[in-house]
């Protein structure tokens, strides 16, 4: 037999961005509790609004199933006394398990006998277990939480009501003075209380009180109303999933309405208008079918269609004030030159241990010029780098960016164009913030890519130099994101920049600037290890096997595009028939070559058989061809060596008692091993 179960946590309005994750957490905790208590059920449905987190468990068993449990007790030598009777330890074990001594048996485990009991446990009634769900509710965690009243519980918002029902029965428990009942609350202004007769009635009972408890239904209702408005007005209202998710979690009964603003505000940069509407007011911007921004907006009301004109006028008034402020800020910004703005950067501290923004920009300039040298850029291009790095943070002191920080870079591009900077420089000012997320868009220009890489790597190394490094989940300065972003840009451009060497040079530059608190070699080692770990993430995103990741990073990880290519090619051929014997042969070379010592050069006159000469000839050919071979051709060249390597080992005693012969043979293998290791640390690859 089974019944439905309903649990609703009624709260003061939660921050919209935490509603979805909170109800998902509640679902998981309830599911885990049910499984731990061996209570079967068919499915769990979730409902959520800004004022409630709810789970409805369908077809929950009315009692646990009877089950057989086993328990292990003391060893036999402890369980029996000298006369073969049960000892106090054995009798105590029997009492603790609520069985008679006669029920005790022995079982051998790894040569030692232990007491065991097997007992049937009668399943408990579900109603007897459900009150402990109180701990599930109180154990929830949130990104933000608060105290209220005189209780000790920290929660996302104060709990105002609770429902816990199994079928028609109320499950009794209390949290912070709030007792469970079968009564919920409707819409704050339009609804009344709702008495739930049984769990399955919950959605409809709340709908009668102007609450759409199903978040997906609220979202779909908003989308349908947006599409209807588009069709009616011949507008285009672009779907923004983040904004749609947020407004869905801001309302309980959604009604879409439109408003207007003065056409003269369209003279502001489009990004300023859109940001004002979306980020500050949670409005949807309106476009024409030709993608032109129109002097209208769409918002979602938490209520019905009554007095929509009044609501629209109120929203228009708020937006008008916002746009008036933005227009003032924009006009003030146009009065100052870029150089005047740059001068103010020397008064802004980037970090107390790393100086001002002006000082950071000078360091980034040096890094960008290092990158330009690696890429053989011409002097004219380097002059663009110098101009760019002299100004690229200037918009941080503008009024618009002060009011709308999310527009940094975007406004820099616009102001730079207005003041006659080269388009390439203006675009790079915007692009240096990219990517803004792990999967975000990358810079599309070479200049933007250079400055983005330089800015990110200088930030990374700078913080390592003053011993500020990510620990566990803590990364307050986004250093993991900086490293990952820089590597994505390098890979996307296919630039064979020696990254580890570059990091070492940046550390030396930081020391020259007086920013290094730790020994330079220690910093170099730490930051290079950190970058290698980020490289692992890059390769994991390409679905590379973990052992192959270890192999290529253990080889030469210096140039990122080549590293990714090597990993992908190894991953592609790992199931090929020739792959295993090739890896085994190369691994044998690498392992024995580790015994090579000193600077012994190969002397062909010491060869004693044709197999030594054959391997030597193949290595000489590899030396000559290697630099011009593609990554896949290098792997083919190694595979072609397998027979020669096998013949060599079958017919040559490397560790000869003759020291001169031994050293000569180790030197030959060491030469080959150096090429293998540059490609990958083959002994890391699992071919068993």
From Swiss-Prot:
The GO terms this record gives for MF are: ATP binding; glycine-tRNA ligase activity
Primary localization class, coarse? cytoplasm
What superkingdom heads the lineage?
Bacteria
Catalytic reactions on record: tRNA(Gly) + glycine + ATP = glycyl-tRNA(Gly) + AMP + diphosphate
Q: What is its EC number?
A: 6.1.1.14
Q: Where are the membrane-spanning stretches? A: none
Which Gene Ontology terms describe the biological processes this protein takes part in? glycyl-tRNA aminoacylation
Does the entry feature the keyword Acyltransferase, yes or no? no
According to the UniProt entry, the coiled-coil residues are none
Q: Which UniProt keywords apply?
A: Aminoacyl-tRNA synthetase, ATP-binding, Cytoplasm, Ligase, Nucleotide-binding, Protein biosynthesis
Q: Where in the cell is it found?
A: Cytoplasm
Can you cite an annotated GO cellular component?
cytosol
The entry sums up its family as follows: Belongs to the class-II aminoacyl-tRNA synthetase family.
Question: Quaternary form?
Answer: Tetramer of two alpha and two beta subunits.
Question: What is the protein named?
Answer: Glycine--tRNA ligase beta subunit
Can you name the source organism? Answer: Listeria welshimeri serovar 6b (strain ATCC 35897 / DSM 20650 / CCUG 15529 / CIP 8149 / NCTC 11857 / SLCC 5334 / V8)
**Species lineage, top-down?**
Bacteria, Bacillati, Bacillota, Bacilli, Bacillales
């Amino acid at each position: 037999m089974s019944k439905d179960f309903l649990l609703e946590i009624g709260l003061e309005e939660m921050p919209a961005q935490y509603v979805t994750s909170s109800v998902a957490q509640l679902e998981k905790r309830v599911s885990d509790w049910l499984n731990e208590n061996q209570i079967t059920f068919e499915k769990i449905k979730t409902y959520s609004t800004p004022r409630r987190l709810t789970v409805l468990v369908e077809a929950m068993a009315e009692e646990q199933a009877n089950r057989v449990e086993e328990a292990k007790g003391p060893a036999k030598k402890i369980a029996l006394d000298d006369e073969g009777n049960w000892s106090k330890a054995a009798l105590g074990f029997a009492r603790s398990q609520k069985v008679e001594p006669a029920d005790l048996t022995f079982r051998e485990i790894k040569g030692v006998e232990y007491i065991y009991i097997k007992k049937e446990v009668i399943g408990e009634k579900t109603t007897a277990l459900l009150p402990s769900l109180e701990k599930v509710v109180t154990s929830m965690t949130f990104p933000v939480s608060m105290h209220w009243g005189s209780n000790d519980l920290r929660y996302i918002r104060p709990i105002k009501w609770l429902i816990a029902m199994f079928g028609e029965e109320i499950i009794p428990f209390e949290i912070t003075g709030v007792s469970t009942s079968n009564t919920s609350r409707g819409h704050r202004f339009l609804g009344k209380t709702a008495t739930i007769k049984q769990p399955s009635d919950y959605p409809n009972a709340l709908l009668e009180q102007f609450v759409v408890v199903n978040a997906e239904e609220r979202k779909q209702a908003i989308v349908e109303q947006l599409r209807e408005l588009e069709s009616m007005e011949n507008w285009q209202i672009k779907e923004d999933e983040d904004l749609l998710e947020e407004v869905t979690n801001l309302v309980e009964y959604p009604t879409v309405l439109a408003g207007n603003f003065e056409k003269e505000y369209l003279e502001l940069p489009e990004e300023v208008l859109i940001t004002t509407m979306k980020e500050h007011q949670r409005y949807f911007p309106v476009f024409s079918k030709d993608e032109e921004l129109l002097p209208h907006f769409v918002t979602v009301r938490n209520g019905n269609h009554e007095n929509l004109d009044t609501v629209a006028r109120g929203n228009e008034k708020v937006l008008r004030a916002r746009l008036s402020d933005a227009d003032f800020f924009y006009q003030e910004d146009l009065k100052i030159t870029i150089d005047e703005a740059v001068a103010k950067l020397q008064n802004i501290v980037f970090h107390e241990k790393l100086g001002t923004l002006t000082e950071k920009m000078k360091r980034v300039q040096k890094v960008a010029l290092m990158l330009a040298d690696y890429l053989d850029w011409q002097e004219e291009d380097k002059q663009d780098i110098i101009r760019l790095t002299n100004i690229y943070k200037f918009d941080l002191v503008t009024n618009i960016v002060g009011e709308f920080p999310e527009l940094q870079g975007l406004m820099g591009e616009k102001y730079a164009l207005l003041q006659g900077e080269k388009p390439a420089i203006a675009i790079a000012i915007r692009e240096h913030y990219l990517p803004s997320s792990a999967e975000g868009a990358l810079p599309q220009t070479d200049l933007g890519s250079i400055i983005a890489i330089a800015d990110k790597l200088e930030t990374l190394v700078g913080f390592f130099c003053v011993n500020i490094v990510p620990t566990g989940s803590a990364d307050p300065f986004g250093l993991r994101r900086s490293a990952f972003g820089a590597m994505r840009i390098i890979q996307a451009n296919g630039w064979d920049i020696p990254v580890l060497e570059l990091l070492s040079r940046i550390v030396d530059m930081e020391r020259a600037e007086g920013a290094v608190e730790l020994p330079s070699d220690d910093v170099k080692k730490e930051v290079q290890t950190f970058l290698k770990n980020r490289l692992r993430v890059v390769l994991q995103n390409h679905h590379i096997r973990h052992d192959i990741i270890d192999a290529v990073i253990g080889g030469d990880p210096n140039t990122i595009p080549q590293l990714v290519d090597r990993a992908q090619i190894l991953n592609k051929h790992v199931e090929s028939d020739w792959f295993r014997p090739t890896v085994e042969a190369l691994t044998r070379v690498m392992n024995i070559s580790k015994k090579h010592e000193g600077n012994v050069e190969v002397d062909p006159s010491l060869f004693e058989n044709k197999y030594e000469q054959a391997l030597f000839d193949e290595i000489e050919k590899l030396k000559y061809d290697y630099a011009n071979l593609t990554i896949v051709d290098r792997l083919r060249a190694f595979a072609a060596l397998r027979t020669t390597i096998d013949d060599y080992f079958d017919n040559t005693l490397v560790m000869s008692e003759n020291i001169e012969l031994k050293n000569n043979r180790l030197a030959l293998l060491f030469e080959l091993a150096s090429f293998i290791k540059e490609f990958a640390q083959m002994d890391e690859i699992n071919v068993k």
